[in-house]
Amino acid sequence: MNDLLKTKLKLIPHKPGCYLWKDEFDQIIYIGKAKDLYNRTHSYFNGPKDNKTSKLVSNIKDLEYIVVNNVNEALILENNLIKTHRPKYNILLKDGSNYPYIMITNEQYPRLKYVRTYDKNKGIYFGPLADSTNKYQLFNLLNSIFPFNKCNHQPHQKCIYYDLHRCINQVQPQTYEKAIAEVKEIFKGNLDHILAILENKEQHAVAKLDFENAQKYAEQQKALTYIINSGLVQLDNNESFDVVGFYEKNNYLVIIIFNYVKGKLLNKSADTFAIYDHEINELITSFLMQYYSQNRISTKIIVSLDDDNLLALSQRFKTKFINAQTKFHKQILKLAFDNAILYFDSNIKSVINKQNELDEALNQLKQILKLPDLSMIECFDNSNINLSLPIAGMIVYQNGKLNNKLNRKYNLMTTKNASDYHFMIEVITRRYQRLVSQHQKLPNLIVVDGGKLQVNAALYALEQLQISIPLIGLKKDQKHKTNAIVLANGDEIILDRKSVLYKFLANMQNDVHNYAISFLRNKHTKSIFNSLLNDVQGLGKKRLNELLNYYDSINDLKSASDQELLQFLPKNVLVNLREKLNKI
């Protein structure tokens, strides 16, 4: 422990708050909360420690702390700080790991949607749902049974789904309320009423010799029963609650959440984490803060935690976080813990191997480049169509893992002397001129997709900005496969295709290429639409964007029926559009 850290530790007060451990590069590597900051921070340096906690402690060179009024405030602050900094040694939910929901919008004419974000102000949510494939089948089935609104058209307009008898169009609010009530019952596992309705429709169709619809209703009954029942475990009571089980071994932690609705298990989610802190209560609490900040929360959560954290979570989410108190709750909690053990045993080898491969790849890259830290890597790729519509994409790796929230897209403005060289100069200049002007931290490494040309262009841009950041290129072979690292001095290091470093860099190059090319395709499609259709009378920017969001190409637009297009356009504009499309 250095003298600076010793001095700061002596000055920490016996008050609640958050502490931020930093490494020798001033990077925040771990964030925690405490009822007593002094006692909690000193506990890291007192007494025996396991290997992973020792690894964390050995990297601690400095700290910051923030004092708050109570543990509840500390819990909220900790969650916000973790979201912002995503420290290396914290438990982090994977980016985009939100579980799916089936949602009924709160619009005047409600729609049924399959979504991965939860916002209680936008509608009624059912979930979270674990099995994406099965639950998407359920979504399609519900959409076929209940004719919710299928589009964004005005209520006086009929759409293609209306003609297929799959869209209600304009109806009385009571009709929607009835459909919503039926969906709620289905998600409670109460199928008797809807199955009776479908059976009645089947018999009515048979009586009319309408065997096609009779078969459809029979298949809907069978599919609905299978999908719902295959995902349910029935309890002997009618409670709704979540159960959190966990298991820790060899510095790895499995957390499982069971979601029960009206006595039926609707969902099981599981995550595995490497852990570097010995306070399991704090780790579980941090995870639950992240999880329930982006997923729907039950009215009761049963979890084995200390009273302080249970109270803080309850106050934060305004719901009950409790220890198992009844015999029944203890049995359910034991089931969750048993499942966590089974999940650990079946998945831990894969988790450890992936983490070891990532650590080894980063260590190999550090050795090659003689860099002590690679916690932040920014990777660039430019793309264009014969030097027109130039764009660039930037992806960001934090501690070796892609953080999609930090990715950026650039519409490049270079027109004079347009070339790959000048496009690279522009994007590097724009990116780091902004970081410097906003006093933001620079990355540990810049990676450009390309060879000496792209590397030299990026170096020139950095020189003009008078900043120094380590930089390499990733060069492909004649088969367009990742082949070599191009150093700033122009030297090339051929990669061993069997190495973990090759796998890491090849994935990085593919990720940035796919990110950039996807952006270019969207821009190209929009450009074609604009150039071909900008003179269609009545087709303004708003309507054109609606068509762009729905149709991938001019050919798709040409093959669309009038019924489809009338969802977006008045009849007179549709006539003008058809005249234009017939000339293309």
Swiss-Prot record:
What InterPro entries is this protein classified in? Answer: ConA-like_dom_sf (IPR013320), GIY-YIG_endonuc (IPR000305), GIY-YIG_endonuc_sf (IPR035901), GIY-YIG_UvrC_Cho (IPR047296), RuvA_2-like (IPR010994), UvrABC_protein_C (IPR050066), UvrC (IPR004791), UvrC_RNase_H_dom (IPR001162)
Q: Which GO terms describe its cellular component?
A: cytoplasm; excinuclease repair complex
Q: PANTHER family this protein is in?
A: UVRABC SYSTEM PROTEIN C, UVRC/OXIDOREDUCTASE
Its annotated function is as follows: The UvrABC repair system catalyzes the recognition and processing of DNA lesions. UvrC both incises the 5' and 3' sides of the lesion. The N-terminal half is responsible for the 3' incision and the C-terminal half is responsible for the 5' incision.
Entry's family note: Belongs to the UvrC family.
Which stretches make up the UVR domain? 192-227
Q: Does the keyword DNA damage apply?
A: yes
Primary location: cytoplasm
Where does it reside? Answer: Cytoplasm
Which Pfam families does this UniProt record tie to the protein?
Answer: GIY-YIG (PF01541), UvrC_RNaseH (PF22920), UvrC_RNaseH_dom (PF08459)
Q: Which Gene3D superfamilies match?
A: 5' to 3' exonuclease, C-terminal subdomain, GIY-YIG endonuclease, UvrC, RNAse H endonuclease domain
Q: Which GO terms describe its molecular function?
A: DNA binding; excinuclease ABC activity
Q: What is this protein called?
A: UvrABC system protein C
Q: Which GO terms describe its biological process?
A: nucleotide-excision repair; SOS response
**Domain GIY-YIG as annotated: residue spans:** 14-91
Tell me yes or no: is Cell division among this UniProt entry's keywords.
Answer: no
Which proteins does it associate with, and in what oligomeric form?
Answer: Interacts with UvrB in an incision complex.
- Which UniProt keywords are listed? Cytoplasm, DNA damage, DNA excision, DNA repair, Excision nuclease, SOS response
